[in-house]
A protein has these predicted regions:
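Active-site nucleophile and cofactor-binding loops and adjacent substrate-binding regions
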Residues: 23-26, 51-62, 77-83, 140-141, ...
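Active-site diphosphate/adenylate-binding microenvironment
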Residues: 5-8, 13, 26, 31-35, ...
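Short acidic/His/Gly/Ser-rich catalytic and metal-binding motifs that mark active-site loops
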Residues: 174-177, 253-256, 314, 360, ...
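Active-site phosphate/pyrophosphate-handling residues
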Residues: 7, 59, 378, 459-462
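Short, well-structured alpha-helical segments that form the helix of a local strand-helix-strand
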Residues: 149, 354, 534-537
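Thiamine diphosphate
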Residues: 105, 113-122, 315-317, 323-325, ...
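N-terminal alpha/beta PP-like core and its mobile active-site loop of ThDP/TPP-dependent enzymes
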Residues: 1-342, 386-389, 443, 468-478, ...
Length: 603
């Protein structure tokens, strides 16, 4: 007869789970043994659950999150009791804040020891009650395992969030109750979930159409909730002669080669997106929870319509005239027949001019030579030229995200993600590995900085060594912008707080990630001079295995937002006057960038 652990793993298999990310420990010995037995039992069919051993449980949760983001399936992570469970939390909050389905399974002290301050005993119900608020259960009886698993999986998929199961150590070895009795006080649950079609009431669709039809300068903003609706968005935009900006999590929703797509919005966004938001008279938000009001239109001058599958997000960021509760694709397909075909192309012509102006400014700023390394804009422009059509790109928190947001252009078929809501450091490398495991035929590219690599990315290169031999196309590329600085923090302090660079806080040791990659048997290239950049990138994309391209970039190249404010300029000046150790260089480089942008606009 099967144990509880064996039944639980087979139940996950019945739900379609084929990969679990985790790290072993004696609090989950029963589950680890069950995974191995399951693997042996399914050896001939070839559809066994694959256990991916990571270097740290946080990265297991990151990988489960990435798996859910890129495949649409449930991500599953596994950790032992106490410290292992604690380590999962940051990655689980990444999943929760970006609204993707992840199930966490964690061990616990034996039932007979709970409450006795036993070794590695932690109050996991309290620890997980926020991150897994949708469904959190400590399993205490074999008869409750079936419905516990079923509800945890269905809850994660249905609510697109995190759920968690806690399994005491002794329960894992008990005999399973695969079919609970048909009696009172037992639950007989089943496997299966099909996501529903959420559509607004016809009356509300007509109200939304009336607002959009009345507008002459319609701007669309899409987020991750619009993934999979590209054709419907294009049709609606063409009907309205609208332009479209993208929140960062929605960067891959639409290809950037469409002339009316302005790119990303916000501090990391483009000039064209900012200008469109300032000049539109109507705003249509689709599947986005973009939080930065200063980059949205003035709400007293613009009419708004929003589409979102989560009713709690409707009207949260902008006082819309019409809020449509519905899934993006289904709602847009019903809305399209109600929209009138606009023929005036002047608004799109204005958007195209802003796009061209932004391109000229970026090109002019990219021609500025770095004083302490390579201009990071050069790195990302050259990287963009080499992106394969079906690649998967992951990004980290930091200045590497700023540059990739502006300079990496999406095409149809590409995938992209990062930690959006949580904006945590460290997910780019585990995200890329999870993406490669899910799509071995695609090139996976992680864009990160030296800070995030030193935090946890470098450890997961060891994990990669364990699995890289599996893939038909073994290319997975790590682009590391090494500026020897926690540069995002440095610039935020300069521009927001008027505080100078604080070396003890922000400066990083210059540790070569490329050299570490070579220790693992991968290709590792360290680019110190601009003339080495193009050959290194060409070699990376031609390689037949994992590659780390470490580029020494200039930390003093400023990241001017598209609408830099007088307050930011004043704060920046204060930081320089307070004795920023890089003040003279930063000021000189910033003046060059401002002048380059001014001359580009004047041409």
């Amino acid at each position: 007869m099967a144990t509880v652990s064996e039944f639980l793993i087979e139940r996950l298999h019945a739900w379609g789970v084929r990969r679990i990310f985790g790290y072993p420990g004696d609090g989950i010995n029963g589950l680890i043994t069950a995974i191995d037995m399951h693997r042996r039992a399914h050896a001939e069919s070839g559809d066994a659950i694959d256990f991916v051993q990571v270097r740290h449980e946080e990265n297991a949760a990151f990988m489960a999150t990435a798996h859910a983001k890129f495949t649409g399936e449930l991500g599953v992570c596994l950790a032992t009791s106490g410290p292992g469970a604690i380590h999962l939390l940051n990655g689980l909050y990444d999943a929760k804040n970006d609204h993707v389905p992840v199930l966490a399974i964690v061990g616990q002290a034996a039932k007979t020891a709970i409450g006795s301050e036993y070794q590695q005993e932690v109050d996991l119900q309290s620890l997980f009650k926020d991150v897994a608020s949708e469904y959190l259960l400590t399993l205490m009886d074999p008869a409750g395992v079936r419905h516990g698993v079923d509800r945890a999986v269905r809850g994660a998929l249905g609510a697109r969030t995190v759920t968690a199961l806690i399994l005491p150590k002794d329960l894992q070895e008990e005999k399973a109750v695969e079919q609970p009795p048909h009696h009172m006080n037992f639950a007989n649950s089943g496997v299966g979930f099909a996501p529903g079609r959420i559509v607004p009431h016809p009356h509300d669709l007509q109200r939304a159409a009336d607002v959009l039809n009345a507008g002459s300068r319609v701007a669309i903003l899409v987020g991750a909730g619009a993934i999979g609706a590209v054709d419907a968005i294009e049709a609606v935009a063409d009907r309205l002669q609208a332009g479209c900006a993208k929140a960062l999590l929605g960067k891959a929703v639409l290809p950037d080669d469409l002339p009316w797509v302005t790119g990303t919005i916000g501090l990391l966004g483009t000039l064209a997106s900012n200008e469109m938001m300032q000049q539109c008279d109507t705003l249509l938000m689709i599947g986005t929870n973009f939080p930065y009001a200063q980059f949205l239109p003035a709400d007293d001058k613009v009419r708004g319509v929003q589409i979102d599958a989560n009713p709690l997000r409707l009207g949260l960021r902008f006082p819309n005239e019409v809020n449509l509760h519905g899934t993006a694709l289904d709602t847009l397909e019903l809305l399209l027949p109600l929209l009138e075909q606009k023929t005036d192309a002047s608004w799109r012509e204005t958007i195209a001019r802003h796009r061209e102006k932004g391109t000229q400014i970026d090109a002019a700023r990219g021609r500025i030579s770095g004083s302490d390394g390579i201009n990071p804009q050069d790195l990302f422009v050259e990287l963009n030229r080499r992106l394969p059509d079906d690649c998967v790109i992951t990004a980290d928190a930091g200045t590497s995200t700023n540059w990739s947001s502006r300079h990496l252009k999406m095409r149809r078929g590409m995938k992209w993600s990062l930690s959006g809501g949580l904006a945590t450091m460290g997910p780019a490398v585990p995200y890329a590995i999870a993406a490669k495991l899910a799509f071995p035929e695609r090139v996976a590219i992680a864009v990160t900085g030296d800070g995030a690599m030193q935090m946890n990315g470098i450890n997961e290169l060891i994990t990669l060594r364990h699995y890289a031999h599996r893939w038909s196309d073994p290319r997975i590329i790590f682009i590391v912008a090494n500026n020897r600085d926690l540069n995002q923090v440095t610039w935020e302090m300069r521009e927001e707080s008027g505080a100078p660079d604080f070396p003890a806080s922000q400066h990083l040791p210059d540790v070569s990630t490329a050299a570490f990659a070579r220790l693992l048997g991968f290709e590792g290239m360290r680019v110190e001079h601009i003339e080495e950049l193009v050959p290194a990138l060409d070699a990376a994309f031609a390689a037949r295995g994992p590659v780390v391209v470490e580029v020494l970039t200039d930390p003093n190249i400023s990241m001017f937002p598209p609408n830099i404010t007088s307050e930011q300029i004043i704060s920046f000046g204060k930081a320089m006057l307070k004795g920023d150790p890089e003040g003279a260089t930063v000021f000189a480089q910033s003046v060059k960038e401002v002048l380059a942008g001014m001359f580009a606009q004047a041409e």
